Design a protein with these regions (language model features):
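Walker B catalytic acidic pair
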Residues: 137
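Conserved core of the PLP fold type I
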Residues: 1-124, 141-142, 147-158, 162-163
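Conserved donor-binding loops in enzymes that form glycosidic bonds
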Residues: 166
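Walker B beta-strand of ABC/ABC-like P-loop ATPase nucleotide-binding domains
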Residues: 102, 133-134
Length: 167
């Protein structure tokens, strides 16, 4: 391990009180490459990938390009704010063909910052249905109102069932 890995571990410890090993850091040449690898690692051909719309277009494009099916959980626009339809989310997560949830936190393109309670609800639902959470937290540094809750640092279960990415 090198200077960069030590700095990343130290930063997560200070910012989120979350500890992990330097050996758990893996590099990818791009977000698209890393996402494609994760989709192939955690799903089967023809399997479903849960995601929330509106969504960053590469999420759907890469899912389809890798022979998987997009399972869309639309965010509802209510009183000027995007809200999660947890009933629909759980129904989709319970589908035996679904094994991966692509979480964008904060959400891109809406800018929605999920609360720790909402993230914990995602974790509970996904853990109950053996769905891995891939948490794209690349925009976590751009939260201007409220506070970013770091998914893997929320609980042991969250750390166990999630993979996260940042740059």
């Amino acid at each position: 391990s090198g200077v960069l890995e030590r700095a990343a571990v130290s930063w997560c410890q200070r910012k989120y009180n979350f500890t992990f090993s330097e050996s758990e850091i893996h590099y990818c040449p791009s977000m698209s490459f890393g996402l494609a690898i994760a989709i192939r690692a955690f799903t089967q051909p023809g399997g479903k990938v849960l995601m929330q719309t509106p969504i960053y277009p590469p999420f759907t494009e890469l899912t389809k390009a890798n022979g998987r099916v997009c399972s869309m959980n639309p965010l509802k626009f209510v009183n000027g704010r995007y809200e999660v339809d947890f009933e629909d989310f759980e129904r989709r997560a319970a589908d035996p063909d679904c094994s991966l949830f692509l979480l964008c936190s904060p959400h891109n393109p809406t800018g929605r910052v999920f609360s720790a309670d909402e993230l914990n609800r995602f974790v509970e639902i996904c853990a109950a249905h053996d769905v891995v959470i891939l948490s794209d937290e690349v925009h976590s540094g751009f939260v201007f109102k409220g506070e970013h809750a770091f998914l893997p640092g929320l609980s042991e279960t969250a750390a166990r069932i999630s993979v996260w990415g940042s740059s």
